[in-house]
Amino acid sequence: MRYIIFVFVQIALGYALCRYVGRRVPGDQLLRKVLKWSVIAIPILSIGLILTTSLLKGRAPELVTDLLIAEIYFAALFALLDSATKSHYGRVTALLCLSLILPVMIAGRRNVREPITTRYRIVLPDKKPSDSVRIALVTDIHLGELFGEEHLARMEQMIEQASPDYVFIGGDLIDRNLSDVDTLTAAYHFAHLREKVQGLCFVLGNHEYYGDLDENVQWISSLGTLLRDSVVRLRPDLYLIGRDYYSAWDKDLIPLSSLAEQVPDGSTSILLQHRPREHWERDPDVSGIDLTLTGHTHAGQIFPMQIFQPLLFSHNYGCHPSGDGTLIISSGYGASTSRLRIGSRSEIVVIDLYFKGT
């Protein structure tokens, strides 16, 4: 399907280019004929180049996606600046803007390849326990065709440097199929992490449902504690509520209130779920949830998605008040479809949770 979309976009862009330039070429000149043939030649040559240079490395789908993104950016800028090219100033401006596409694509790769550590300090003055807690939140790892051992090794190193008490994996650990994952190597990295923390907990994301759900669930359960609409006590008076992924899937939604009721009064409750709450969601906010941790949005991943995500979610990234508590949305550690981020950055999140008297 990705290659079909690629061919379609190539032909559409080639046709638009031919019509645009053709109107400006007087008479029946050779250039106009060449442009007509380029509608067919451009996609064929592009696909041939990609397949011959990268198929053996297994990176053809990713490069196709990146090329499409670059071309869409190019076409959008070309269309927006077309009216300005009638003057010398407009032509210079257009060339400068178009020249930024390659640096932006390079920076977009760097935004995924060099993740950062984002830190938050949350104070709960009226809650137990008395000892502070450090949590590492990692969402949207997307193990599979795009990300593998190097991706996990870097994540493990970043988490170890943060020295958390608990590690929470907030869904989309697997991009789609477990067959695309080096499960032995991945299990080694998570086992190494599990030895150094007090708890390693997981919830499912939408991508776990895209593949063989039973197989994905069985493997993730072997790595640590998988929570599917369940509650686990981390410490005395500190509880983690883990929510299953439910959006767009035909299943009965367990009310969050029924899960929150399992947390004793006066105890601290942390909610871990993959997706932040959407505007029209029928499950209301529940008072008493002290900290909600989510991912899924990728903080838009590629501009201009950051503009449209607020139509779905109240927030798409960062730390925000939520009911009686705090909501933290991570941009995610990996990326979806392409190892490219424009206007967002891959990250792990470290939360220092303080209580009364600490």
Question: Which residues does each PLM region occupy?
Answer:
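Alpha-helical membrane-embedding segments
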Residues: 63-66, 89-101, 122-127, 151-162
